[in-house]
Design a protein with these regions (language model features):
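Short amphipathic alpha-helical "recognition" segments used for binding
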Residues: 1, 43-45, 127
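Short secondary-structure boundary micro-motifs
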Residues: 2, 18-20, 99-100
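Bacterial N-terminal signal peptides
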Residues: 2-12
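Short, low-complexity intrinsically disordered segments
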Residues: 7-9, 30, 57, 97, ...
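Short, structurally constrained coil/turn elements
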Residues: 11, 28, 65, 109-111
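N-terminal active-site segment of His-dependent metallophosphoesterases
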Residues: 17-93
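Extended active-site neighborhood of metal-dependent phosphoesterases/phosphodiesterases
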Residues: 84-140
């Protein structure tokens, strides 16, 4: 590829760039919203990815009024392991730090919008099967 061809290609990139961000809005002013948060365990288990969960809940908090958010539902699998024992599991955080990090992410919603956090299979015991106990009620 010649330098001129490369320059032409790079010059055209801004034209194909993403459009400017537009704030979400309801089409009907009578409408309201339910926000559903999917499995969070992928964000909970690593120090580097926990801020992504905080960005998600901060976005919700910033849009409560604009989208008339009535409730937030988290479908479960909040953490990777309820009780992390030994090595061999993915992630670099203990289960306590996983639970605390996700609870901290939801703090921004406290007193602003009701939210429900369900348990998933990752939120019980230290394997995906076994005793049916969870630390969810200690953090939420």
């Amino acid at each position: 590829m010649t330098l001129a061809a490369l320059a032409a290609m790079l010059w055209s990139l801004p034209a194909a760039a993403q459009e400017e961000y537009r704030q979400p809005a309801l089409e009907n002013p009578e409408s309201w919203s339910v926000v559903v948060i999917p499995d969070l365990q992928g964000y909970a288990k690593n120090e580097a990815s926990q801020p992504i969960a905080r960005l998600m809940t901060a976005w919700i908090a910033d849009n409560i009024e604009r989208l008339n958010v009535r409730v937030v539902l988290c479908v479960g699998d909040v953490v990777e392991q309820n009780d992390r024992i030994g090595n061999g599991f993915s992630g670099d955080l203990t289960s306590v730090r996983q639970w605390q990090g996700m609870a901290d992410a939801f703090d921004v919603l406290d007193g602003r919008v009701p939210y429900l956090v369900a348990t998933g299979n990752h939120d019980y015991t230290y394997t995906r099967s076994g005793a049916r106990r969870t630390h969810l009620n200690e953090y939420f």
